[in-house]
């Protein structure tokens, strides 16, 4: 039995000096979170009494008016956090505030789970976060009385190795933690500072947090309510709160998962792209809560970077936290939550794309390039992501899915054709497309920077390989078998380009890898392609721009055998004076520079380009 009239002094079971070094260092570098921890503990105490009262009605005297109260005494330089929750007795104080590695509330949560009553939410970190109070306080007093008991107790410590417990006076159950603030912590006596901290960290604690009589939080965790109970206006208001945005959410995803890891997610897809969407840090903006207590709004292991446009909350009572609550442990439960949430988001986007294609096209314009990052970063879900990707194409102004593209493939078409570049408008006008348009073969127009990179990881879709129309042979011969007779007749009538090709190779030398007749050109005289097996034209350009490739590889110059310029030059190349023909030599370089310009590049030698152009024009006049 404890003598109720004697003040007792104890040593902490874990060296407090070492603990406070941790608390004051990297784990608790942001001092304001001490208030979050104390409010969280107060909320836990109220939750615990609310549950106990279900089976012990005599404890229910405060069950309908649980609250957390903050009080400031500027003269005494104290800040107090009070609750009317379960309270503590002498033994609880020894266990929870005298032992670092143990938590009475944690033990209660384990017992709760063993009774399979997972609908009662508790968080089990009391006794750990409590010590963050010593970051700002030179002494901490805890006055408490356990529900259903008559004795009150006062715990006190300066955090220097010992604490005392003595009888106290308290009229009702609950706990008051009083911080005697250090000289450098006077900011926490200011009401505006306290309001800001509560708004930031404890807005959705399910009990009111009051300063005097003013409620500082909404005391309503909207995500814990049934989806049908939440109005569109309430969703918009909450979205504005968690996102600091002013648009309306494009889509709402409210999901509750019960199983291995219980969690609730309330996520919003914005209708406008956030300003920081493409910042290098690629931060997540989904807030992580543990039982309605805010933990972090940039937990990299909660939401993949390719879903960083999401706003909202994920709340779980099953996560374990480290001593600071600033960093999550390497907890496999968090990985399971991440996978569950990610799959749900991708599933919802797939439904939205099928139900409202036009609406989804607007989403894709805002967030498509970001979502496609997942094709590189998330191999496990790559197929799901690819299903909901959309692409511009030569067919119409609308974006298309790969499945729809394949449904429109021509007879004999065994590849998904694409052209990539920086500018969507320019690549849509590329001469490389001419032969494909002539045969009504659809080509995807890829203008996002990420496109060239995911194509290095994904080589096919539904059995059809991706093929760039700026690399290798055009492969148009086998498409539309019925047109082969016409193609054969055209080839028979095509001029002999052998002499011209030889002359161009001789003049251009190492500037080109090869010169060939083209089957992809119908209107333009020439184009440049990468040879089969070489780096694609656009990827090479990107690598050079970022300093990852020094020298460009020579490309293949393709000639349109039906173009008047080519036929005239072919005739000229047959002459006996072709080897010394200045106009033919100038024309060779002009054709190469024309192909470069069509690809969005500049002539190799602008001054020579101008001279040659002037010379050829002069000869023609």
UniProtKB/Swiss-Prot annotation:
Q: Which SMART domains match?
A: HATPase_c (SM00387)
Q: Where in the cell is it found?
A: Cytoplasm
Region of interest (B), ranges: 326-541
Region (C) residue spans: 542-621
Give a single Pfam family match.
Answer: HSP90
| Keyword Cytoplasm applies | yes
Going by the UniProt record, its keywords in alphabetical order are:
ATP-binding, Chaperone, Cytoplasm, Nucleotide-binding, Stress response
Could you tell me which Gene3D superfamilies the record lists for this protein? 3.30.230.80, 3.40.50.11260, Heat shock protein 90, C-terminal domain (1.20.120.790), Histidine kinase-like ATPase, C-terminal domain (3.30.565.10)
| Keyword Chaperone among record annotations | yes
Q: What does this protein do?
A: Molecular chaperone. Has ATPase activity.
PANTHER family on file? HEAT SHOCK PROTEIN 90 FAMILY MEMBER
Family from the record: Belongs to the heat shock protein 90 family.
Task: State what protein this is by name.
Answer: Chaperone protein HtpG
Species for this entry: Roseobacter denitrificans (strain ATCC 33942 / OCh 114) (Erythrobacter sp. (strain OCh 114))
């Amino acid at each position: 039995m404890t003598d109720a009239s004697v003040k007792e002094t104890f040593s902490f079971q874990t060296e407090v000096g070492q603990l406070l070094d941790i608390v004051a260092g990297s784990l608790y570098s942001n001092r304001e979170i001490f208030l979050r921890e104390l409010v969280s503990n107060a909320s836990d105490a109220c939750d615990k009494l609310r549950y106990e009262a279900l089976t012990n009605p005599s404890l229910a005297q405060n069950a309908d008016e649980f609250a957390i109260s903050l009080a400031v005494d500027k003269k005494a330089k104290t800040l107090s956090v009070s609750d009317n929750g379960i309270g503590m007795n002498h033994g609880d104080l020894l266990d929870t505030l005298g032992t670092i590695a143990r938590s009475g509330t944690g033990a209660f949560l384990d017992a709760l789970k063993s009774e399979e009553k997972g609908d009662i939410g508790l968080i089990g970190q009391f006794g750990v976060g409590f010590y963050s109070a010593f970051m700002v306080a030179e002494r901490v007093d805890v006055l408490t009385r356990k529900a259903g008991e008559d004795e009150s107790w006062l715990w006190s410590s300066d955090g220097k190795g010992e604490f005392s417990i003595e009888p106290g006076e308290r009229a009702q159950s609950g706990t008051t933690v009083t911080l005697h603030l250090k000289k450098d912590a006077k900011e926490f006596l200011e009401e505006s500072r306290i309001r800001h901290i509560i708004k930031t960290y404890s807005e959705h604690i399910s009990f009111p947090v009051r300063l005097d009589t003013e409620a500082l939080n909404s005391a309503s965790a909207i995500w814990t309510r049934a989806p049908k109970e939440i109005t569109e206006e309430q969703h918009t208001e909450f979205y504005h709160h968690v996102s600091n945005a002013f648009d309306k959410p494009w889509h709402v995803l409210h999901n509750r998962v019960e199983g291995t890891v219980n969690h609730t997610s309330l996520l919003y897809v914005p209708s406008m792209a956030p300003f920081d969407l493409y910042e290098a840090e690629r931060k997540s903006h989904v807030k992580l809560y543990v039982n309605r207590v805010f933990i972090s709004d940039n937990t990299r292991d909660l939401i993949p970077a390719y879903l960083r446009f999401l706003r909202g909350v994920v709340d779980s009572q099953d996560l374990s936290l480290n001593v600071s609550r600033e960093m999550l442990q390497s907890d496999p439960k968090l990985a399971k939550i991440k996978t569950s949430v990610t799959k749900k988001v991708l599933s919802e986007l797939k439904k939205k794309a099928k139900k409202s294609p036009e609406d989804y096209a607007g989403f894709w314009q805002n967030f498509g390039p970001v979502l496609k990052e997942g094709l590189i970063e998330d191999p496990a879900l790559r197929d799901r992501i690819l299903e909901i990707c959309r692409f511009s194409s030569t067919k119409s102004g609308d974006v298309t899915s790969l499945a729809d593209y394949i449904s429109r493939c021509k007879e004999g078409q065994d590849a998904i054709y694409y052209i990539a570049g920086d500018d969507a408008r320019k690549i849509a006008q590329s001469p490389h497309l001419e032969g494909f348009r002539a045969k009504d073969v659809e080509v995807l127009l890829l203008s996002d920077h990420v496109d060239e990179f995911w194509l290095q990881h994904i080589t096919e879709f539904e059995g059809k390989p991706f093929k760039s129309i700026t690399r290798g042979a055009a492969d148009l011969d086998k498409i539309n078998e019925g047109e082969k007779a016409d193609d054969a007749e055209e080839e028979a009538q095509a001029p002999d380009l052998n002499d011209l090709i030889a002359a161009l190779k001789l003049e251009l030398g190492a500037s080109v890898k090869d010169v060939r007749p083209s089957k992809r050109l119908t209107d333009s005289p020439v184009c440049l392609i990468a040879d089969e097996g070489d780096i694609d034209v656009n990827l090479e350009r990107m690598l050079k721009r970022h300093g990852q490739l020094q020298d460009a590889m020579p490309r293949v110059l393709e000639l349109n055998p039906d173009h008047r310029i080519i036929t005239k030059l072919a005739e000229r190349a047959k002459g006996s004076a072709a080897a010394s023909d200045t106009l033919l030599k100038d024309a060779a370089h002009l054709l190469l520079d024309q192909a470069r310009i069509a690809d969005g590049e500049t002539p190799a030698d602008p001054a020579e380009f101008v001279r040659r152009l002037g010379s050829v024009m002069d000869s023609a006049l």
